Amino acid sequence: MIEPALVALRFAAAFGCGLMAGLFFVFSVAVMGALARIQPPEGIAAMQSINRVILNPLFLTVFLGTALVCFLIALTSLWRWHEAGAAWLLAGALLYLVGTFLVTMLFNVPLNNALDAATPASPDAARLWADYLSTWTAWNHVRSITSFAAMAALMAGLYLQARG
């Protein structure tokens, strides 16, 4: 039998992964396409604004909190490897930590920082914006897929542990 605190932790991780998957999915299928249809100076300015507004307490709590909980789940899954569902829990935690959190920190955030330093009306704006759109969106697709897969793996682990 698993402890209620571990169940709550695992559920919170799955829920957080699902929230992040939804956010990234919307950017991949709607927001970035809409921004690509407007002129580069306006697109750059809009994305700069989005990048500033999204750094709010609720987003940061879900994004960073899910990473912290996934780190704890990875550790407990290794320590409790003999339990049903441990491999799924570890896989889900690692998918989020590597495919969502690390991808964000290593790829999307530096791209956002470079865009933030740009002047929307500069002569290089069109090239910068085209490069940003393709590269940032590709990495966002990775985050969308891995956060969804992390949620599914965590839910599978929860299900298997509930069955015993």
Each model region followed by its residue ranges:
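Core segments of transmembrane alpha-helices
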Residues: F63-I73, T146-M151
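Structural signal for membrane-spanning alpha-helices in multi-pass inner-membrane proteins
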Residues: F24, C70-S77, T104, L154-L158
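Juxtamembrane boundary at the C-terminal end of a transmembrane helix
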Residues: Y159-G164
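Internal alpha-helical transmembrane segments of multi-pass membrane proteins, especially GPCRs
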Residues: F11, R52, L90-A91, S134, ...
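Interfacial loop at the N-terminal end of multi-pass membrane proteins
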Residues: V7-A8, L19-L64, P110-S134
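Interfacial segments of alpha-helical transmembrane regions
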Residues: E3-G18, L75-G99
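Hydrophobic alpha-helical transmembrane segments
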Residues: T61, D131-F148
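Hydrophobic alpha-helical transmembrane segments of integral membrane proteins
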Residues: A91-N113
